[in-house]
Amino acid sequence: MKPMRQKPGRGQGNKSISNALASKKKVSKNQAVFFDYRDERKLKRFINDQGKMIPRRITGLSAKEQNLLTHSVKWARFLAVIPYVSDEYK
């Protein structure tokens, strides 16, 4: 029986990825988080160029905070405070 080969890209290489993601955190843990659907500037911090919401592993939000953010972004899109898709991608 042949020994199993390890697939390329598996193993110790993941540590550098986690360090890179840790430096991209958007919110400090000490600050109280409140999302208002009318606050366009604050919501746009959590939306990328394509109009997609940035995931929690990058933003550093808790599950509860990410859920509040999701509802605020969806409501702001519904009321046309922020666009669903950026003008570049239409």
UniProtKB/Swiss-Prot annotation:
GO molecular function, one term: structural constituent of ribosome
Protein keywords: Ribonucleoprotein, Ribosomal protein, RNA-binding, rRNA-binding
Any single GO BP term: translation
Pfam families (alphabetical): Ribosomal_S18 (PF01084)
Stored SUPFAM superfamilies: Ribosomal protein S18
GO CC term, one of those recorded: cytosolic small ribosomal subunit
Disordered as annotated region, ranges: 1-24
Job of this protein: Binds as a heterodimer with protein bS6 to the central domain of the 16S rRNA, where it helps stabilize the platform of the 30S subunit.
Subunit structure: Part of the 30S ribosomal subunit. Forms a tight heterodimer with protein bS6.
Annotated family: Belongs to the bacterial ribosomal protein bS18 family.
PANTHER family: 30S RIBOSOMAL PROTEIN S18, SMALL RIBOSOMAL SUBUNIT PROTEIN BS18M
Protein name: Small ribosomal subunit protein bS18
Gene: rpsR
